[in-house]
A protein has these predicted regions:
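Conserved catalytic core of the tyrosine transesterase superfamily
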Residues: 1-169
């Protein structure tokens, strides 16, 4: 493959230049193989519909949200209640790929389902608080400035885990 050939060539160039102290750049110009750019594999709309039809519950909502908004999987998993803006149909993605923040759309056809999911999260959070739980991880600086923020509804995960766990910190 192209990457294997490039790695071997770079190893030889390193050997000659840094170990043997022979500079080959002036004497030879090796032919470098190019990577072949393959087009991405994309599902047809009918395949997507069949996939969604085979799913149900929270995984189906997550898949539809990822597909409809262009989010990455971990961005969806890390989504918090306060990151959903129903007024402007926006989703705020914090700390996405490359640590960057960005904004994407909340698909119109998922508004009601997302609203029900957030209402379920609020109810679950209320029950957790009554039982002495309900804290979520928040950035340390924020936790110092607002000690009770980790218990607020806005910081709760939109798609919480099924099992309750306690943050060891």
């Amino acid at each position: 493959s192209a990457s294997t050939q490039r790695q071997a060539l770079n190893a030889i160039v390193f050997l000659y230049k840094n170990v043997l102290d022979i500079h080959l750049e002036d004497k030879i110009t090796p032919a470098r193989s190019k990577r072949t750019a393959s087009p991405p594999t994309v599902m047809t709309p009918s395949e997507v519909q069949r996939l969604f039809a085979a799913m149900e519950g929270k995984p189906a909502l997550m898949a539809k949200l990822i597909y409809g908004s262009g989010m990455r999987l971990m961005e969806c998993i890390r989504l918090r209640v306060q990151d959903i803006d129903f007024g402007q149909n926006l989703i705020f993605i914090r700390g996405g790929k490359g640590g960057k923040d960005r904004t994407t759309i909340l698909p119109q056809n998922l508004r009601d389902e997302m609203f029900r999911q957030i209402e379920a999260v609020k109810s679950l959070h209320h029950n957790d608080l009554e039982e002495g739980f309900g804290d979520v991880y928040i950035p340390e600086a924020l936790a110092r400035k607002y000690p009770k923020a980790s218990r607020s509804t806005g910081w709760q995960w939109v798609f919480p885990a099924k099992l309750r766990s306690v943050d060891p910190r």
